[in-house]
A protein has these predicted regions:
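Binuclear metal-dependent hydrolase catalytic cores centered on His/Asp/Glu-rich metal-binding motifs
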Residues: 172, 176-179, 191-231, 235, ...
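Conserved beta-sheet core of the metallophosphoesterase superfamily
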Residues: 176, 226-305, 309-310
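Membrane-interface segments at or immediately adjacent to transmembrane helices
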Residues: 41-118
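Acidic/histidine-rich helix-loop elements
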Residues: 64-70, 95-108, 131-136, 162-165, ...
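Non-catalytic terminal accessory segments
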Residues: 1-73
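Core catalytic region of metal-dependent phosphoesterases/phosphodiesterases
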Residues: 103-190
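Beta-strand-turn-beta hairpins that frame and shape the catalytic cleft
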Residues: 73, 79-93, 179-180, 186-199, ...
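Active-site neighborhood of phospho(di)ester-bond hydrolases with catalytic His/Asp-centered motifs
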Residues: 93-96, 123-129, 153-160, 182-185, ...
Length: 312
């Protein structure tokens, strides 16, 4: 979906070119004012939901003089207090939107997944859009097999491109790699770490999360799109992990993403947000799609440390 701001701005420029006389000559300025007003409102709303910045980031450094960032991977580290845990720390690593294909080097995807395991995560979440074309399924299996492992498991949901391509084949590739799909249900983790459940939703393309979320559980939710955040927050979700947006994939320094595939425009384009009682983390993803190029938008791995600093 093209952002409303970009659409209105284009409309203003088009009107300015063709309307030069009469009362309608003011039309371009009215359209431009509407676009600027909408952009200002969206910035206010986004600021209201924005939460913490990463406590640190490791990887390729962003530079104004280096616009092409297609494979400039960065790992972002976040911390959230979670006193209900029975352990001092539960580390979650998230990857999203591999869009794995031969358009990017196989070695890039392998190195990206290896960097996830190198963080010694307790959990790994794979939040959808693993492939975009049927031809890439063998490559997906090659890259995934034997590569991802975490102390308490690796979990995944499918994304819209997975459903549009070959959902059953993607499920089989995930399963063969030892990855557990949580499409509309929950998996309870060992009681030794606390009351923690890992759940998934594949709405609106697949099954919606139907399992009730208990208020006393720490519920970690995989949702390919961040558009589900309002419903999930209302259901009592604790932390939601999403992708889908690619961070816009094409960004302008000082402005941000030009295009974000979300009903809420750029509101949840990338990073950490707080909606209701839920934390939301949105990954920019690892791959790129239409075009297979990133401009001022680095691919990322998100690492969230849920920390109990009150003693266990």
């Amino acid at each position: 979906m093209v952002g409303l701001f970009v659409s209105l701005l284009a409309g203003a420029l088009l009107a300015a070119r063709h309307v030069r006389r009469g009362p309608l000559r003011l039309l371009p300025w009215l359209i431009l004012l509407l676009a600027l007003g909408h952009e200002a409102l969206e910035r206010v709303i986004r600021h209201r939901y924005a939460a913490s910045a990463p406590v640190r980031s490791v990887g390729a450094a962003a530079s104004l003089w280096h616009p092409i960032t297609t494979t400039d991977l960065v790992v972002h580290f976040f911390e959230l207090p979670e006193p209900a845990l029975r352990v001092k720390r539960l580390r979650v690593a998230q990857i999203s939107d591999l869009h794995i294909s031969s358009r990017l080097p196989k070695a890039y995807f392998e190195a990206a997944l290896d960097s996830v395991v190198a963080q010694d995560p307790d959990l790994i979440f794979v939040t959808g859009d693993n492939v975009s074309h049927v031809d890439s399924l063998p490559l997906l299996s090659e890259v995934l097999t034997g590569r991802l492992h975490a102390r308490f498991g690796v979990f995944a949901v499918l994304g819209n491109h997975d459903f549009e391509t070959a959902p059953e084949a993607v499920r089989q590739a995930l399963s063969a790699a030892g990855i557990t799909r949580v499409s509309s249900d929950c998996v309870r983790l060992p009681q030794s770490i606390g009351r923690v459940v890992v759940c998934g939703t594949e709405a609106p393309w697949g099954p919606k999360l139907e399992t009730p979320l208990a208020a006393h559980d720490l519920s970690l939710i995989l949702s390919h799109t961040p558009d589900n955040i309002y419903d999930l927050a209302a259901q009592g979700a604790s932390v939601v992990f999403s992708g889908h947006t690619h961070g816009g994939q094409l960004r302008v320094p000082g402005f941000g993403a030009l295009v974000v595939p979300s009903s809420y425009g750029r509101r949840f384009d990338e990073g950490h947000f707080r909606v209701g009682g839920a934390d939301l983390f949105v990954s920019t993803g690892l791959g790129a799609y239409h075009p297979p190029l990133r401009i001022y938008c680095q691919p990322d791995v998100i690492v969230v440390d849920l920390v109990n600093d009150q003693g266990v």
